[in-house]
């Protein structure tokens, strides 16, 4: 699989480099680039393993993983775009810290994607008067789009996969002290950075608009929170329904619509997709268009994510196949090794299958004490390490977690000059150094 792993690496490198060297070309032709890299994987794969196996692998990726992934992003993007937070709040270091902290805790309630889409526009609007603000969105990605999702299976898809394999729903609340420690460190770093940037803006004569007779916060489209709850319920059902006998055949397999060979669109997935799309439709039908206009709502961000991630999902299959086949032969047996291995791979591959690979590896080590899962008993510290690695390290790159790229795209749309792919990685590494330094 060396050649196909090279395709995945080249695809990621293309995403990283092309916006820097040929930004206009990339904006026009990113879909063509994704098709090219996908074909460079699919054609040699078909020649080596046979066309049926290649078709099955691509369809399994698209039907089994990508479809529910992009529908969830689409639903939350639509519903959050119909909610507008406004009022007299203006962006300053204290207000920004409070908003980031609240958004971080919201991530475990409505998911990192839901919280990101809900809070990103208010944060951008509150700080629209400022010039030095890219750091605000970088730390938004660190906190709201990633580490905040570690407390419940709703928060991040890897934990949902753990829940569907026997980890109790509230088990990840054990990560609360880890979350709080990281929040304190990150928000402290952020406050000092934002205070310096804020003072620079004030020195340059930039001043926020003072809104008299305005409430502190006013919410337009508040009824859309009901649709967010619908989407959260759909996500929970996707983890619960496959365990029920009513959704299993005699062999214990989840029932569904056969697509090709072993590829099946399961009934729980269909139910999840239907609920999410219904929530998005109702959101648009029941919310005045003026709310979306005031939010500067466009389809650009979700289109960009949909195009780029379909290529990433397809071309990352060889790397995941290597991981699955290697499994316990990787020689990773200690919690800290699990943390760094899961985290490093989750930075560039989808963190959900990466989490499952290492959870399966840990479950096959024949431990006798720990958390009982359908994959075997996993020691508490090892499960904590795998969970933190998958959830936290998704913040290391724009492609480590889907909300990262969504936030970047929306920030770019609103005139915030976000760091490049490698520039963002530098931010994440510097932040890690500062946390360790404290």
Spans of features found by a protein language model:
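Juxtamembrane and boundary regions of transmembrane helices in multi-pass small-molecule transporters
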Residues: 132, 151-152, 170-216, 392-438
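Alpha-helical transmembrane segments
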Residues: 61-72, 171-189, 259-277, 340-344, ...
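Transmembrane alpha-helix boundary signature
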Residues: 20-24, 42-65, 74-91, 105-118, ...
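Long, contiguous bundles of hydrophobic transmembrane helices that form the permeation core
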Residues: 186-253
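Short, small-residue-biased leader/transition segments that mark boundaries at the very start
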Residues: 1-3, 7-9, 437
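Transmembrane helical segments that form the transport core of multi-pass membrane transport proteins
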Residues: 228-357, 361-364
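Interfacial loop-to-helix junctions that mark the boundaries of transmembrane helices
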Residues: 4-5, 25-34, 55-67, 169-178, ...
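Membrane-interfacial helix-loop connectors
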Residues: 44-46, 107, 118-132, 136-138, ...
């Amino acid at each position: 699989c060396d050649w196909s792993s090279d395709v995945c690496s080249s695809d990621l490198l293309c995403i990283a480099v092309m916006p820097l060297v040929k930004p206009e070309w990339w904006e026009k032709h990113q879909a063509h680039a994704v098709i090219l890299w996908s074909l460079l994987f699919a054609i040699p794969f078909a020649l080596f393993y046979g066309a049926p196996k290649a078709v099955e692998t691509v369809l399994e990726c698209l039907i089994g993983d990508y479809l529910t992934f992009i529908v969830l992003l689409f639903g939350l993007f639509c519903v959050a775009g119909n909610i507008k937070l406004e009022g007299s709040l203006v962006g300053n270091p204290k207000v920004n810290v409070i908003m980031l902290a609240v958004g971080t805790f919201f991530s475990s309630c409505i998911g990192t994607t839901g919280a990101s889409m809900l809070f990103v526009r208010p944060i951008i609007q509150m700080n629209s008067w400022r010039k030095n603000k890219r750091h605000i969105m970088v730390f938004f990605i660190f906190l709201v789009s990633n580490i905040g999702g570690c407390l419940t299976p709703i928060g991040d898809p890897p934990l949902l996969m753990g829940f569907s394999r026997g980890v109790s729903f509230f088990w990840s609340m054990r990560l609360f002290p880890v979350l709080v420690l990281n929040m304190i460190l990150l928000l402290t770093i952020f406050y000092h950075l934002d205070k310096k940037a804020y003072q620079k803006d004030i020195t340059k004569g930039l001043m926020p608009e003072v809104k008299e007779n305005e409430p502190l916060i006013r919410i337009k489209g508040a009824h859309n929170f009901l649709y967010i709850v619908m989407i959260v319920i759909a996500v929970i059902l996707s983890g619960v329904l496959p365990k029920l006998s009513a959704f299993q055949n005699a062999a214990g397999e989840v029932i569904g619509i056969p697509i090709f060979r072993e590829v099946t669109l399961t009934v729980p997935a269909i139910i999840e997709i239907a609920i999410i799309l219904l929530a998005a439709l109702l959101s648009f039908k029941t919310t005045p268009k003026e709310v979306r206009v005031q939010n500067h709502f466009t389809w650009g961000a979700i289109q960009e994510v949909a195009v780029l991630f379909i290529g990433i999902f397809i071309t990352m299959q060889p790397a995941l196949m290597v991981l699955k086949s290697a499994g316990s032969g990787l020689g990773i047996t200690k919690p800290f090794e699990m943390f760094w291995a899961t985290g490093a791979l989750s930075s560039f591959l989808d963190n959900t299958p990466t989490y499952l690979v290492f959870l399966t590896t840990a479950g096959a080590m024949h431990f006798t004490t720990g958390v009982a899962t359908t994959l075997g008993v996993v020691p508490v510290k090892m499960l904590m390490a795998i969970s933190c690695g998958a959830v936290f390290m998704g913040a290391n790159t724009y492609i480590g977690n889907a909300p990262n790229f969504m936030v970047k795209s929306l920030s770019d749309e609103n005139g915030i000059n976000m760091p490049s792919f490698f520039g963002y990685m530098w931010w994440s590494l510097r932040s890690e150094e500062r946390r360790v330094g404290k």
